[in-house]
């Protein structure tokens, strides 16, 4: 048993909550499995709940530990499993939330206050709220986001539910805690403490790998320290690194923002050890240039060092900016719609101008054409300030039919907020976009679910396919034939079918029904829907493949938990949330930006099992000097 596991068991036997902090490649999941096995051995009649971030992680832990008293599930499944039998309380709480403006839950198409008997009146006596892959509140069906918000409200409001869960599970463990929604942490470390029943809560993860804005990031405020003796969680650090070579470990340690400093594994069988029992040295290199020479660098790595960028299991190219990848990955049109549609840009230009003039509320209820007439009438001398820019005008003239339709659409649907995160947000791609907090639009989330279900069917994973679809059961041979023919049609004709056609077919076959969120999105975004629905479904498939990592390139967000022999990191971005120059010198950026950037860079660097190359196009002298400090002067190269 690892010494870190021994310390954790000591805390468990004392009834103390704990956190296992382990850096990249430390074997945190292995420690989690060891802890579970030891708890089972010591408390064979007690049930253990283990929450993980994705279904893939659920299956991995279940494969390693097979015991009837172990319940491994995603966070959402755990929450629903524990509140689903409190139907009266669910209905009461849902009604309260539907009638509260800031609850994050609303009833599509319903005006006024929702009556207290909404989920009981004119329904069967045994009518129950259900949790599914889609939301239809009118029918009492909630989805992932609603389960999280509903659960938090119910655990706060009903101590008896807390008591029920603590009695049911004396041990609750959370894997990858840093990505967990803060509401979950509040339930486990605040609401749980208000009920005296014994229950040990354990967290496993790494705050340096907290790269999603909606995750808790860390639980430092709950840790028991000299400065915080009233905390409720004991920290145990796991310092060994079993993945990375020494050169990468040294670099990664210089990036960490906490007290944890990793060291090579002492296990001679660890992947980063040589045959004679020494840690691999590996290599780190920093390349820079006066202009973008990415292709030149990739040719050099291929020809001189034998890198094979088509071998996605061993070699990975990481970029931050999706735009650099869209053309190569085959979703250029969808990217253009979400990131640089000129009619939407014109709508935003009108909105911003109207706001400065105090007339935004006057034009919000109008169609686009009428809103332009209002501005033209009120501010004729300011026409240059609200007229289309040259680029916007060129697009409008080249797409006159599209613009003519847009003129008759609601102004707010044109001047809407849309960005590439709504197409490509990297949150929870393993779990088909299931994670709460994903920035995917409801429409793109729906497209991802369709392709996910198709892939399950093609992989002959019929149990997971049935669980993921809206199909209740297949009882007739004709039904099975219709389903197979429908999926075969999509797979064989995706080049010729539009996104709209595939959505309708998947809905009719109940592979993926159009729920409240999708219908609301289509209704409230007629211009975006007009543009997206006519795009080839092939682009949606390419987006899915890209988000799932089935391409030779990725954004840096996508690789947490993965590892490759060769890693190329390209530090090129125009995102305001990150500033790569701040990695190399103090340029006065806000700490939140510096912290976010360092964590993302840390995740990228620690993917490398052998060789790490970092490339910075158009690097300044200050960046180059900072790189020499981080990488060592002998590891700096120009192209």
Where are these regions (language model features)?
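The feature marks helicase ATPase cores and/or their adjacent C-terminal helical subdomains
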Residues: 1-639
């Amino acid at each position: 048993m690892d010494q870190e596991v021994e310390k954790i068991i000591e805390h468990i036997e004392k009834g103390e909550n704990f956190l296992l902090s382990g850096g990249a490649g430390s074997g945190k999941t292995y420690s989690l499995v060891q802890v579970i096995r030891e708890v089972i051995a010591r408390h064979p009649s007690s049930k253990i709940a283990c929450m993980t971030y994705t279904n893939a992680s659920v299956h991995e832990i279940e494969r390693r530990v097979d015991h009837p008293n172990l319940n491994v599930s995603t966070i959402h499944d755990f929450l629903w499993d524990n509140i689903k039998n409190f139907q009266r309380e669910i209905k009461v709480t849902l009604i309260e939330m539907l009638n509260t403006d800031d609850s994050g839950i609303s009833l599509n198409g319903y005006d006024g206050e929702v009556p207290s008997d909404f989920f009981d009146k004119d329904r069967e006596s045994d009518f129950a709220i259900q949790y599914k892959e889609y939301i239809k509140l009118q029918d009492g069906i909630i989805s992932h986001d609603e389960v999280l918000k509903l659960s938090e409200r119910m655990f706060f409001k009903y101590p008896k539910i807390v008591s029920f869960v603590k009695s049911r599970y004396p041990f609750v463990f959370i894997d990858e805690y840093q990505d967990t929604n803060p509401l979950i942490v509040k339930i486990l470390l605040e609401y749980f403490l208000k009920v005296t029943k014994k229950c040990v809560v354990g967290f496993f993860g790494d705050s340096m790998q907290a790269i999603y804005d909606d995750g808790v990031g860390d639980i430092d405020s709950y840790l028991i320290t000299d400065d915080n003796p009233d905390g409720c969680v004991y920290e145990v650090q796991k310092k060994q690194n079993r993945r990375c070579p020494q050169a990468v470990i040294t670099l990664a340690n210089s990036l960490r923002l906490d007290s944890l400093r990793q060291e090579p594994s002492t296990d001679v069988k660890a992947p980063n050890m040589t045959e004679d029992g020494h840690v691999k040295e590996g290599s780190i290199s920093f390349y820079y240039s006066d202009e973008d020479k990415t292709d030149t660098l990739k040719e050099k790595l291929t020809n001189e060092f034998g890198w094979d960028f088509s071998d996605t299991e061993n070699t990975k190219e990481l970029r931050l900016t999706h735009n650099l990848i869209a053309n190569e990955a085959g979703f250029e049109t969808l990217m253009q719609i979400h990131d640089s549609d000129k009619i939407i840009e014109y709508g935003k230009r009108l909105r911003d101008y109207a706001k400065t003039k105090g007339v935004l509320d006057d034009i919000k209820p109008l169609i686009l054409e009428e809103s332009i007439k209002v501005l033209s009438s009120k501010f004729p001398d300011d026409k240059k300030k609200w007229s289309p820019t040259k680029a916007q005008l060129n697009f409008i003239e080249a797409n006159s039919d599209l613009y003519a339709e847009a003129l008759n659409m609601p102004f707010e649907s044109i001047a809407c907020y849309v960005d590439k995160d709504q197409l490509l947000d990297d949150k929870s791609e393993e779990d088909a976009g299931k994670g709460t907090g994903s920035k995917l639009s409801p429409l793109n989330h729906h497209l991802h679910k369709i392709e996910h279900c198709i892939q399950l069917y093609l992989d002959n994973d019929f149990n997971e396919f049935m669980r993921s679809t809206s199909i209740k059961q297949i009882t007739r041979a004709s039904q099975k034939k219709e389903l197979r023919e429908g999926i075969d049609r999509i797979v064989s004709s995706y080049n010729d079918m539009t996104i709209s056609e595939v959505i309708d077919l998947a809905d009719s076959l109940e592979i993926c029904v159009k729920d409240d969120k999708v219908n609301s999105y289509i209704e409230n975004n007629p211009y975006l829907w007009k543009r997206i629905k006519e795009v080839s479904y092939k682009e949606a498939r390419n987006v899915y493949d890209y988000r799932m990592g089935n391409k030779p390139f990725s954004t840096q967000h996508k690789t947490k938990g993965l590892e490759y022999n060769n890693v190329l990191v390209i530090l090129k971005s125009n995102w305001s949330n990150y500033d790569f120059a701040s990695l190399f010198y103090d340029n006065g950026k806000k700490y939140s930006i510096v912290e976010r950037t360092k964590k993302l860079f840390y995740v990228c660097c620690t993917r490398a099992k052998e060789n790490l190359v970092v490339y910075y196009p158009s690097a300044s002298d200050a960046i180059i000097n900072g790189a020499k400090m981080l990488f060592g002067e002998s590891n700096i190269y120009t192209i």
